[in-house]
Amino acid sequence: MACGPGDLQSLTSPLSSARLDYQPSIEGPWLRACGQTNVSCRVVKGKLVEVGKWPWQVSILFLGTYICSGSLIHHQWVLTAAHCLQRFKDLSLYSVMVGVHQRPENSTQLPLTRMVIHKDFSNLMSQDIALLKLRDSISWSPFVQPVCLPNIKFKPSIGSMCWVIGWGTTGKKG
């Protein structure tokens, strides 16, 4: 793990050909573009951890309990997996927590106003994608920032380094 005090690590943004229907808001010197991390090291329970490595990661809650992760793509929109939302469509049962690192003390829990599940999603995990709209627009901070979305023609080459993030299990129990 390579941690420096507040190191800003730049990731390439594949958004150059994307069309925006709003004027992006740059709210601080630490937000130059999507996909930016603002890593700092902290000791949590005796272990060195990187805080701010994935500032777009959010926790999706069902009745206040974690069920899935998602990614901030806009001030009011979260991208997630459709299978996380397939059992219940009642928005009042869900919320999103932003700014979560190890513990939720410094995070903000937000209600939703809309859920969009891909029209061709099935339990077979085909088209497993959904969007959640937050009731209120959030402000970017060093630890709450948007992820980049790839260009529609983007196709990673075999052997490309990819990251999967979340708070789920990493293997089967037992």
Curated annotation (Swiss-Prot):
Its EC number is 3.4.21.-. One of its GO terms (biological process) is proteolysis. Pfam families: Trypsin. PROSITE patterns: TRYPSIN_DOM (PS50240), TRYPSIN_HIS (PS00134). InterPro entries: Peptidase_S1_PA, Peptidase_S1_PA_chymotrypsin, Peptidase_S1A, Trypsin_dom, TRYPSIN_HIS. Transmembrane segments: none annotated. The keyword Protease applies. The keyword Hydrolase applies. Keywords: Disulfide bond, Hydrolase, Protease, Serine protease. The active site is at H83 (charge relay system), D128 (charge relay system). PANTHER family: ACROSIN, ACROSIN-RELATED. This is Putative serine protease 46. It comes from Homo sapiens (Human).
